[in-house]
């Protein structure tokens, strides 16, 4: 080893120590999560929930559109029917170990029953615990759309009224009257 190589090596070490010393007092980029809350954008897509309508009933009508729209196939459900003809999911299951939180299920839902919330704390120790059933997904409130009630808008919630007499619903069109 020559003297020149020793001086170059020594200079490299001094430069490295100098840079470490400069960065030791710089502002830290790492956030200490539990103590310091993380900013989430307004449209952040996190945990999926099933909401209820303002009357307290489930919004989901088991139309299966969310399961069809899901690109990874992590949603499964089975339709059942009540005495008054309303559909509801007998079981509703989401496998969060497969979910990519794309939000296509929320867009496909005609009743706004399935919604993505900003909750992201879903860590589990076993994969089996990431399979959520309907009881785990249902929340007590209406979520993002507090006044929306699918059956009231569709004309099925009010007993004794015909189609076209619900809120914000146009009267049925008599197709024969349009003929020449």
From Swiss-Prot:
Cofactor(s) the record lists: [4Fe-4S] cluster
Binding-site residues for [4Fe-4S] cluster 1, renumbered to this chain: 60, 63, 66, 109
Pfam families: Fer4_7 (PF12838)
Any GO BP: aerobic respiration
EC nos: 7.1.1.-
Main localisation: membrane
Keyword Acyltransferase (UniProt): no
The UniProt record lists the keyword NAD: yes
Database matches in InterPro entries: 4Fe4S_Fe-S-bd (IPR017896), 4Fe4S_Fe_S_CS (IPR017900), NADH_quinone_OxRdtase_chainI (IPR010226)
Residue positions binding [4Fe-4S] cluster 2: 70, 99, 102, 105
One GO cellular component term noted in the UniProt record for this chain: plasma membrane
Co-factor binding details: Binds 2 [4Fe-4S] clusters per subunit.
GO molecular function: 4 iron, 4 sulfur cluster binding; iron ion binding; NADH:ubiquinone reductase (non-electrogenic) activity; quinone binding
Location of the 4Fe-4S ferredoxin-type domain: 50-80, 90-119
Assigned keywords, A-Z: 4Fe-4S, Cell inner membrane, Cell membrane, Iron, Iron-sulfur, Membrane, Metal-binding, NAD, Quinone, Repeat, Translocase, Ubiquinone
NCBIfam families per the UniProt record, alphabetical: NuoI, PRK05888.1-1
Function: NDH-1 shuttles electrons from NADH, via FMN and iron-sulfur (Fe-S) centers, to quinones in the respiratory chain. The immediate electron acceptor for the enzyme in this species is believed to be ubiquinone. Couples the redox reaction to proton translocation (for every two electrons transferred, four hydrogen ions are translocated across the cytoplasmic membrane), and thus conserves the redox energy in a proton gradient.
Subunit structure: NDH-1 is composed of 13 different subunits. Subunits NuoA, H, J, K, L, M, N constitute the membrane sector of the complex.
Protein's UniProt name: NADH-quinone oxidoreductase subunit I
